[in-house]
Amino acid sequence: MNKAVAKPDEVLSTLNGLIETCRDGQKGFADAHEKIQHAEIREFCLEQSRNRARFVGELQQEVQHLGGDPENTGSASAVLHRAWINLKSALGAGDRSIIAACENGEDSAVSEYRKALEQNLPANLRSVIEQQYLTIQQAHDRTKQMRDSLDPENRL
């Protein structure tokens, strides 16, 4: 049984929610880049911040194409807010704490993208969101690997 394509206002709400999610990630990774000492991880954080900025632009373009007003701020969602507040709190700590907070933020981003992909979106939007989701999922996995590599006992 095929579900009906999501209503335009639902699609716009989903896209704007993902814009907020990406803005949160962009800022979180930028903050981490400024504070992390480990060169490889610093570069990774910068790359992820840039990826999220690119995703914001892509999603905003889709919102405009649908006749909507793209979100211009970060998230008010409590889940994402807590994840990135944890990053802020960790900024006074070592690299492992900071990258662990990034991983928490990535957990939230992966979850938001999965929710979006559960909707019956138009094919062109689904393609954009799936590509971004795959990049975010890979970043999440890499973030976890980096966190584990910084753990002296390498606990999972």
Stretches with model-predicted labels:
Residues 1-156:
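Amphipathic alpha-helical hairpins
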